[in-house]
Amino acid sequence: MKIDLFDFDLPEELIAQTPLPNRDASRLMVLDKKTGEIRHETFRNILSYLHEGDCLVLNDTRVMPARLYGEKENTGANIEVLLLKQLEGDRWETLVKPAKRVKVGTEITFGDGRLKATCVDTLEHGGRILEFSYQGIFYEVLEQLGEMPLPPYIKEKLDDPERYQTVYAREVGSAAAPTAGLHFTEQLLDDIRAKGVHIAFITLHVGLGTFRPVSVENIEEHDMHAEFYQMTEETARLLNEVRQQGGRIIAVGTTSTRTLETIASKHNGAFVAESGWTDIFIYPGYEFKAIDGLVTNFHLPKSTLIMLVSALAGRENILRAYNAAVKERYRFFSFGDAMLII
């Protein structure tokens, strides 16, 4: 399948640079995945499309302040470090700039010296394995010394870093936010529960690979990045009960979708408590085993994410909806508007 099949024209001014003052004031496009019918709503009206007995599945990952600025021991040269993935113990896969200054054995000091790192291995494209030493608890030190890494298409500085977190974020470990969840407020979640809609949580730590462009002509040849996921006993039990009672499972975000589909694919459609790494790549032709609907933002042309939503709603329906979104001046990408596919 050719990558150009997932291209569309997007004016740059439609890429949202800042979040709206109120999370649930975003626009919501509702797309019927069978008929292709489109409706235009406000996000807080999502409630009218959810039924008693349905289940919304949210990703409770929390974005870590993964960008660090340090100095090379001995020379004092400035080094930028971006944490990508925790390995064993205090070792992390990272991206460093300038990479040529960081070789095996290089030591880097951050802030007042409470955090230090030693390079123990080199990878391609500026990747380095760093081993950290610190005083206290690693994530607390990181909160004080690190900065929030925003997607490359967001050029403006974020006034309030919490706006790049969901209101239910709790499991620290992501390099990027699961952005479909940014539209929910505590009040909206309470209203959803009051209607008899279940809310379940999974965890998938989003890696920067989510922004990596597809560089192959035939999408089947794309090498998908792996991300850590986890499902608890409580969530697995709830999802199996919802399925047995005829409720719909609606994923909030492509990250929740990939977690649910990974687990259901391994267990004949059932949900089981487990953790692991997933590199599932969902594109047209994929048969969904877990979800009935999806809440998601508007994605980049030719991205793996637009391929995923095309698998669920049909490529032609998605491209028609995206063209309508451009015409109606919807806001795109991380801080943009949302789509409900049901």
Swiss-Prot record:
Pathway: tRNA modification; tRNA-queuosine biosynthesis. One of its GO terms (biological process) is queuosine biosynthetic process. It is found in: Cytoplasm. One of its GO terms (cellular component) is cytoplasm. GO terms for molecular function: S-adenosylmethionine:tRNA ribosyltransferase-isomerase activity. Keywords: Cytoplasm, Queuosine biosynthesis, S-adenosyl-L-methionine, Transferase. It catalyses: 7-aminomethyl-7-carbaguanosine(34) in tRNA + S-adenosyl-L-methionine = epoxyqueuosine(34) in tRNA + adenine + L-methionine + 2 H(+). InterPro entries: QueA, QueA_dom1, QueA_dom2, QueA_sf. SUPFAM superfamilies: QueA-like. Its main location: cytoplasm. Its EC number is 2.4.99.17. The keyword S-adenosyl-L-methionine applies. Pfam families: Queuosine_synth. NCBIfam families: PRK00147.1, queA. Monomer. Belongs to the QueA family. Transfers and isomerizes the ribose moiety from AdoMet to the 7-aminomethyl group of 7-deazaguanine (preQ1-tRNA) to give epoxyqueuosine (oQ-tRNA). HAMAP family: QueA (MF_00113). This is S-adenosylmethionine:tRNA ribosyltransferase-isomerase. The lineage of its organism: Bacteria, Bacillati, Bacillota, Bacilli, Bacillales.
